[in-house]
């Protein structure tokens, strides 16, 4: 009896056969049959955890939803209550040396950090003293600031926002490292974990080098810019989104919002798209390269990670703290404006691409330490206006503006959105108000990642085993949510995986769920259908081989078949030391 997978492959193969024939005939082609999410059968339940009275099981994904099929929105793991006769064995507390003080939580600190007025133990047990404290900063009352406390953000390699910061940034190691904070106009104290905190305002604004002829080309560019993931290609798992580890409320333009809103711009009119990006950076930080002080809660979570590899436990840990942390980052705010342009009006008014880009920029710059918007529009820009609500004349070049803002307070960001969507351009006062609000509501606008397992103290019991399991878990995480489980697109379309759904991002002359149809309005109408090379999609990597005599191991993958003459860029063989 034919399996569901085999049946879908045969139907998909028939579809591509009809596609090749239909292309030759120049006929519109139907969309391919939908592909629903397919899961692997659940694993067996783990043994009952005597400390939490829970057990878990996991499953994997064999195919993601595609061509309007059901996405993979379900959980890959689940827990249930259980009971066991075994006693709970708590992880042993660290053995502190004779020169160390042991906090009630078990953390070891240097004895000279006792009774110094600093909270070196998170539980404050180091300050339970009879005599007067020996303050590192003497009589000065210095505190760290919000930027120092938030340094080290977690990063998820697939794009979601981790819920907690792994670091304890109220720890100073007994030092009184001071610096001037221009945002508070005061001296502040630098946390031990932060090697450098630098304040320098920098304003950037860029427009894309091209005016995009369709939304998919723009989305493709956005996804490439936001991908931390090398092995997984354009694979993203944003999820529902948890409150950021930065604390407080952040106004965020997530990549998922841009994908959803811009791809949702559907119309029968001929359109083009321009993207304007702006960024205000006011601070940067660099974490200490070694001896980082992690939070007690992070250490407790590490101690309870099972010494036998359990995918759910390690995946859950990475969802909370990230697959990586930020070793170097920049604080600030940024915006992206995506203009949806009416191509017919542009052609009628004979406006070229350079004029469009010039007229749609904000023109932000820095003058005497103040951020201003100083874009002087010339008369050529008078005709570049946003279509007013209820106006059916269709003479405006700008049909709509998608506004995405990250950083700044909610009211300032909302005013910025409203102004741009109504007027089509940025108001200088509204822009300045948003830029000034970033200081109190910053976002992480740039990050350089380091694997999260590198901050686990190697002197804690079982550290090496758990580090090895976390390395494996990151590789499994990328492999599980991977576009290798998608079917290829036609006519040079790019495959992307976003929140459990495979997408085909089409070149501007093609459309359809698989980019199977030629769209003459995307090019000069009189041009014949062009010959376009199909892009194959790599299948998933095989498991690694055993370690060979030359201390290397190997794996392989195949270029997905089904498209006539399609090829994949990259190597079919993988090799690493072991």
Regions found by a protein language model. Name each.
Residues 38-41, 52, 225-229, 482, ...:
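Short, surface-exposed loop/turn motifs at beta-strand boundaries within globular domains
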Residues 117-121:
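Acidic, glycine-anchored loop motifs typical of Ca2+
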Residues 132-491, 496:
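Membrane-permeabilization and membrane-interfacing ectodomains
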Residues 56-58, 231-233, 361, 503, ...:
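Beta-strand secondary-structure signal
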Residues 2-100, 104-106, 111, 123-138, ...:
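Thrombospondin type-1
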Residues 71-73, 125-127, 261-265, 377-381, ...:
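Short coil/turn segments at secondary-structure boundaries
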Residues 109-115, 489-496, 503-507:
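Short Cys/His-rich zinc-binding micro-motifs
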Residues 512:
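Conserved HRD-motif arginine in the catalytic loop of eukaryotic-like protein kinases
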